[in-house]
Amino acid sequence: MTFLEEILAQKAVEVADMPLEKVAEKRKTYSFYEFLKANTNTMQLIAEVKRASPSKGEINMGVNPVLQAKSYQAAGAGMISVLTDPVFFKGSIEDLREVAKNVEIPVLCKDFIISEKQLIRARNAGATVVLLIISALTEEMLITLFEQALALDLEVLVEVHDQKELAVAQKIGAKLIGVNNRNLHTFEVDIAVSERLASDFSSDACFISESGFRTAEDVARVSQKYNAVLVGEALMREATPEAAAKSLKVTR
């Protein structure tokens, strides 16, 4: 089994046991898409709270998610991403709930979403943006979840890894498209993935490059075609995450 296949098998078990929550009031913050459209002079940052990963194992198990998120916000991050997968990334929906209560900016629920139950749970916990990963879904599931998320007044970050997936994301009208430099089957990372796919951008979406960023020089590689980068591990390993996050702000 690949990493992705293993994660999805476990996710199906997790979701089967997950209750269907009633939709509660949505947390108030700004639209991340509108924020990116209005702030184009600088590469914006999605800063991630991530305790562990399947490929790297434990990254920062002792992190205080709220303090980490507040450091990111103080550094000027446009959004906080919170891993909520409990098995492979050692996250939880409670991490997201606590972060959302304590920051003003949008919060992304970073998980392998395969059910509307997860969308409602994310919204109720304070997420205003959710991740849909094309390689984890059939096209029919993708469209269904995309429409369900929009009906819940959630923004959707649609994640792609190749030209075919990018074409699908653009076809369904995704406003936020993330190019993951990490192959979810092997977990190998290469920023060149984002460089290659940029030539195929053809919509009014905002584009985010995800994974593999450690320095401002890394970010500069994608600064002409992308609106933002998503950074997790590099910030989670830093003793001073606010300074580390500030160091990744690059002029476009």
Curated annotation (Swiss-Prot):
Q: Which residues form a coiled coil?
A: none
Q: Which UniProt keywords apply?
A: Amino-acid biosynthesis, Aromatic amino acid biosynthesis, Decarboxylase, Lyase, Tryptophan biosynthesis
What GO molecular function annotations does the UniProt record carry, in alphabetical order? indole-3-glycerol-phosphate synthase activity; phosphoribosylanthranilate isomerase activity
The keyword Amino-acid biosynthesis belongs to this UniProt entry's keyword annotation: yes
Q: Name one GO biological process term.
A: L-tryptophan biosynthetic process
Top EC class for this record: lyase
Q: Which cysteines are joined by disulfide bonds?
A: none
* Annotated metabolic or biological route of this protein: Amino-acid biosynthesis; L-tryptophan biosynthesis; L-tryptophan from chorismate: step 4/5
Entry EC number(s): 4.1.1.48
Q: Which reaction does it catalyse?
A: 1-(2-carboxyphenylamino)-1-deoxy-D-ribulose 5-phosphate + H(+) = (1S,2R)-1-C-(indol-3-yl)glycerol 3-phosphate + CO2 + H2O
Q: Which NCBIfam families match?
A: PRK00278.1-3, PRK00278.2-4
What family is reported? Belongs to the TrpC family.
- Put simply, this protein is called Indole-3-glycerol phosphate synthase
Q: Which gene encodes it?
A: trpC
